[in-house]
Amino acid sequence: MSIPVIFIHKGDHFYLNYSLNQIKITNPETPVYLITDSITHKHSHVTYVDINRYFTEAKEFAKIYKHMSTNGFDNELFCFQRWYILKEFCEDKKLDNVLYLDSDLLLYCNIEQTFHQYDHFDFTISKKLSPHCCYFPSISKLKKFCDFIPKLYLDPNYIDRFLTKHQYHLTNNLNGGVCDMTAFNEYQKEQDVKALDLSLITNNEIFDDNINDADGFEMKDGIKSLLFDKGYYYGTNKETGQRIKFNTLHFQGPAKKNIADYYLGSDFKKIKRKLHFECFLNNNLFLFKVARRLGYKFY
């Protein structure tokens, strides 16, 4: 069976549409699932899944979660809960290997050819922290990670250290704290856990950690300077001068506004016009309500 791609996303934000459509373009035979609280059925190649069907373990985790971050409570909790949602869904559908993607990421490579190379790892990660392109080669390895997460909140060795970390952030007015990225980082310190860091250049290829950051590449207008050639974007490594192929681009934070410029679909102009129109409606509450009442479907 083909490696399925899973998105877990609350709401129906514009950038999600690009990420979903990009999979159809680059991997037309790949099963795509969107686990969400917004069932729109806008994309015929996507299987929409009600997030509430797979929230049992996520609710249980919420009982032990302790908020130790300057970021919002609900957002940080959900970042943890998504891994339990993913596990429940995979168990229910009897999926084994699975590729989880963040909803602000564009993927260009062939999933089957690329990710089966990593079957001997427990999962993929970026800079040992970010799971925005996270491949689990088996459900047992995903379950093992989910079983580890509660230790962060039940084991005194973790709790004391993380409370200190949280206080340091508060005292020094720093953003962040303990989040699911912390869990991934700590999990990699466990015996027999083997993760692959996708942010490292391998065979002149790389998976983008964050298009806002240089990561050793040339920059332009605040993001990586990239050239397009035969279906892929390439960046120039400043240290070696080599041209490096990007298998993904991650439009984190403010870069979400740039995602349309790197989308490969032939319907790019149509979608972009629609998004400009919707931005106009969003700035006019009366017209927005009229459009909703008339049944206009927003991206």
What do the predicted segments below correspond to?
Residues 78-124:
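GT-A fold catalytic core of metal-dependent nucleotide-sugar glycosyltransferases
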Residues 122-140:
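Short beta-strand-to-loop element that shapes/binds the nucleotide-sugar donor at the catalytic cleft/hinge
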Residues 60-73, 157-163:
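An acidic/histidine-cluster motif and surrounding catalytic segment
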Residues 146-284:
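Catalytic core and acceptor-binding pocket of nucleotide-sugar-dependent glycosyltransferases
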Residues 25-29, 88-99, 139-143, 190:
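Secondary-structure boundary elements
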Residues 34, 118-122, 153:
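Catalytic phosphate/metal-binding cores of nucleic-acid and nucleotide-processing enzymes, i.e., regions
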Residues 1-68, 91, 266-299:
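N-terminal anchoring/stem segment of glycosyltransferases
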Residues 11-13, 39-40, 54, 105-107, ...:
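Short, solvent-exposed loop/turn segments at secondary-structure junctions
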